[in-house]
From Swiss-Prot:
UniProt cross-link Glycyl lysine isopeptide (Lys-Gly) (interchain with G-Cter in SUMO), position: K218
Modified residues (Phosphoserine): S219, S223
Processing and modification events after translation: The disulfide bond is necessary for pore formation, but is not required for correct protein trafficking.
UniProt similarity note: Belongs to the claudin family.
Reported disease: Azoospermia, obstructive, with nephrolithiasis: An X-linked recessive, male infertility disorder characterized by epidydimal obstruction, hypercalciuria and kidney stones.
Transmembrane segments: 8-28, 82-102, 117-137, 163-183
Extracellular compartment spans: 29-81, 138-162
Name this protein carries in UniProt: Claudin-2
Organism field: Homo sapiens (Human)
UniProt function note: Forms paracellular channels: polymerizes in tight junction strands with cation- and water-selective channels through the strands, conveying epithelial permeability in a process known as paracellular tight junction permeability. In intestinal epithelium, allows for sodium and water fluxes from the peritoneal side to the lumen of the intestine to regulate nutrient absorption and clear enteric pathogens as part of mucosal immune response. In kidney, allows passive sodium and calcium reabsorption across proximal tubules from the lumen back to the bloodstream.
Keywords: Cell junction, Cell membrane, Disease variant, Disulfide bond, Isopeptide bond, Membrane, Phosphoprotein, Tight junction, Transmembrane, Transmembrane helix, Ubl conjugation
Entry GO MF terms: identical protein binding; paracellular tight junction channel activity; structural molecule activity
Length: 230
């Protein structure tokens, strides 16, 4: 039952990680305008994502424009797009595989490969979490580097957007989910091997008597003397 509970917790975390990765990938707020120095008094604030950028006016109106070209974007944005899409695809595949391998499902109940399928789902969750964490950490490092650089003008500095925080949390959820699924299946396999060895132990002790030792008669197992009652 412990492994079943761990699998459920791992799958829920993996599903939350997938949903969070999808939302973080689509949000246009990977980095937002920084109001420091001469840029404190500005009429327009900008926020940029992987697929679009938005401008928020002082009147409260927000306008978002999708990038007209993808090949003309910076290399870090293109790499982040590819990694986030790949991470979402791998995490989706991990959700499907984990459903087949979990003990609470009806798929392949009599098959011994059920635990291996669950472990494969956990490995895919770990891979998806890593692919989602790399672009988030990469953009986070670039934002902090430009923010504290004296060579970058204040109007070109950005702050960390909420999409990056969501991406970090989602990737950690996917990593933890994969580790939990792999650990639950490995512990269940070790426990089953122990039970098999324990059940086979009495059969091994019921062996034939040693050479030179006469077999015991049934009366020898009785601790009471039969002649005492005559």
């Amino acid at each position: 039952m412990a492994s079943l509970g761990l699998q459920l917790v791992g799958y829920i975390l993996g599903l939350l990680g997938l949903l969070g990765t999808l939302v973080a990938m689509l949000l246009p707020s990977w980095k937002t305008s920084s109001y420091v120095g001469a840029s404190i008094v500005t009429a327009v604030g900008f926020s940029k994502g992987l697929w679009m950028e938005c401008a928020t006016h002082s009147t409260g109106i927000t306008q978002c424009d999708i990038y007209s070209t993808l090949l003309g974007l910076p290399a870090d944005i293109q790499a982040a797009q590819a990694m986030m899409v790949t991470s979402s695809a791998i995490s989706s595949l991990a959700c499907i595989i984990s459903v087949v391998g979990m003990r609470c499902t009806v798929f392949c109940q009599e098959s011994r490969a059920k635990d291996r399928v669950a472990v494969a789902g956990g490995v895919f969750f770990i891979l998806g979490g890593l692919l989602g964490f790399i672009p988030v950490a990469w953009n986070l490092h670039g934002i902090l580097r430009d923010f504290y650089s004296p060579l970058v003008p204040d109007s070109m500095k950005f702050e960390i957007g909420e999409a990056l925080y969501l991406g970090i949390i989602s990737s950690l959820f996917s990593l933890i989910a994969g580790i939990i699924l792999c650990f639950s299946c490995s512990s269940q396999r070790n426990r089953s091997n122990y039970y098999d060895a324990y059940q086979a132990q009495p059969l091994a002790t019921r062996s034939s008597p040693r050479p030179g030792q006469p077999p015991k008669v049934k009366s020898e197992f009785n601790s009471y003397s039969l002649t005492g009652y005559v």
